[in-house]
Amino acid sequence: MGLGLKNVVNNDDELKKVVDELYCGYHGWDFTFGGLVAEKFVAGPEFTTFVTGSFDQPDDIKVYQPVERVFNDKLPDHEKFLSFDRLWDTYENEKPVGEKDYENLWEYFKPDATLEHAIKQLSIDAYCAVFGTGYGRIDIRMDKATGKMYVLEVNAQCGLSEDENYTSIGAMVRLGQDRFSDMLGAIIENALQTKLKRMKAATLINK
């Protein structure tokens, strides 16, 4: 929300214009609550993973099949990301990909097999760094010039669906070995384990 193609800036004047627009709000949404975040644009492939488990039991954390979000090759590098208008098909300020044909913004594929271990390990590290419990989706970018990976987000409230038109989890199910029901079962099991652990801790305190 609030993220558009014009947010990729190349000079101070462009930055000031974007900041001024954000402070004006968008459809009643206040984007300045809590401050604004500016970060380097990472040009390169984008990956996403889904994780279940708890940070305090890192050996039991499960990372499901990572997927690469491969953006339409008609787009220039600085447009290969999920802008709000294109993600939600609003097109108030931006044009759809392919204009008349409304081509897909991206497709999901398995990442290069040589990258999967690093993607999974970075996902676990990021999840534990924010004290993740239950589940989360991790978005990662790799700088195509250096090969270095960056965590874009750890989303603790990501959509849960096996429809990949709605969420990347559907693509993980299609490309991986796990069923969607397995993922939901792992989330429920972790929630029950966490609840039991807290109940035991409360019992010990009250003794």
Segments and roles (model prediction):
Residues 1-8:
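A conserved helix-loop-beta module that forms one wall/lid of the active-site cleft
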Residues 10-98, 149-150:
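Phosphate-binding site of ATP-dependent enzymes
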Residues 16-35, 85-144, 199:
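A long amphipathic alpha-helix within ATP-dependent nucleotide-binding catalytic cores
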